[in-house]
Amino acid sequence: MATVHLRIGDLVWGKLGRYPPWPGKVVSPPKDLKKPRGKKCFFVKFFGTEDHAWIKVEQLKPYHPHKEEMIKVNKGKRFQQAVDAVEEYLKKAKGKDQSHSDDKSKSDKGRKAAKPMKIIEEDDEDAFKGGSSDKPASSMEPITKRLKIIEEDTRSTSIQAADSTAINGSITPTDKRIGFLGLGLMGSGVVSNLLKMGHVVTVWNRTAEKCDLFIQEGARLGRTPAEVVSMCDITFSCVSDPKAARDLVLGPSGVLQGIRPGKCYVEMSTVDPETITELSQVITSRGGRFLEAPVSGSQQLSNDGMLVIVAAGDRSVYEDCSSCFQAMGKTSFFIAGEAGNAARMMLILNMVQGSFMATIAEGLTLAQATGQSQQTFLDILCQGQMASTFVDQKCQNILQGNFKPDYYLKHIQKDLRLAISMGDSVNHPTPMAAAANEVYKRAKALDQSDNDMSAVYRAYIH
């Protein structure tokens, strides 16, 4: 492999972990940021985001010689925005150089040539941000995170006003030992980001083979949930449904057997409020501290560290989890009041998302049935008020016949079912969600459970 010679100011392609190569610029690191030990590396600031990281030299390539190659193999809106940001940066840099050259030529007339003076200018921050107020979601770990505390006045929650704190700079990982139970679509990305940001993590999964990759990345292995909890200060759980969440805590060699006074347990699974209440009671009865923190997002957002965390329960546990939430998510909300409030909020959010996805699928199939172009329908939709990355990606995947799971169809149907049940418990009608739920049940009957939620489309064409 050819030696890469780089210096401050060079444009590069940098590869970080499992993410694709991304355009960036070699810059001077902050004075208080230590260089990692071991192999030679450079501090890189990435275009199209506000991210920076130490990148090993073997993971760097000069920008211009590899530009065409990278553009061919990497796709996506965020990637293109990053490349556009590089070109805008180069254009501005060229303009500054030309202006400086013209000024120098004028000043040189009528006198002897002076020695060239080195001009040092600050980085163009707008170029790194993509020159847009609508900042694209990052493919790397964001360095600007926002932790929000939502304190609402509701019948069940008597709280004050909202507080918001921006956290800037690189993440300083907690010195607490972290445990993680469940390495599914969401959990895998979360653990990867915790490790990448320097947390000490012990993992367990029902299918032990899934732990191997994370052991290679530096995680420790726990043989049982009880062992993980006993080894760690804070243990997170992210499993598929209420039964799995209960079994993990109450079953043989379960979490409850490892709980001791002061141990923290964070339930990230999307389950019903009753399950959360039960788990909270049994954990705290052993002297443990409990927080629920379900997440809104998908496998891709989990991999990107861009989840939205909605938490409730023990506020002090929420604060202890600060660096973990920064590593795995772009925003963290704390909903005051009893444990179970975050579950209620998450079920409502997923009810809306699931119903919306079913409606989009219905629109696509109706367009086809009436002789309209589905692609034109999507193009128009994405130029209107409902335009979003979610709509664009899900619809494009449908048109391409790509139903690789980003969020399992069986899980969104489970969330709809739980939300409808929650509505029944307070005598609140949920007719839209009920109708969508029937369509998802039809899709499950067509063997779409383990496909992406967008496979609900197939319920309309069979």
Swiss-Prot record:
Cysteine-cysteine disulfides: none
GO molecular function: DNA binding; NAD binding; NADP binding; nucleosome binding
SMART domains: PWWP (SM00293)
Binding site for NAD(+): 179-193, 270, 414
Record domain PWWP: where: 8-66
Compositionally biased residues, Basic and acidic residues: 91-111
CDD domains reported for this sequence: PWWP_GLYR1
Stretch list, region Disordered: 91-139
GO biological process terms held by the UniProt record: transcription elongation-coupled chromatin remodeling
GO cellular component: chromatin; nucleus
PANTHER family, alphabetized: CYTOKINE-LIKE NUCLEAR FACTOR N-PAC, OXIDOREDUCTASE GLYR1-RELATED
Domain notes per entry: The A.T hook DNA-binding domain is required for the interaction with MAPK14.
Function: May have oxidoreductase activity. Regulates p38 MAP kinase activity by mediating stress activation of mapk14 and specifically regulating mapk14 signaling.
Name of the featured protein: Cytokine-like nuclear factor N-PAC
Gene name, Swiss-Prot/TrEMBL: glyr1
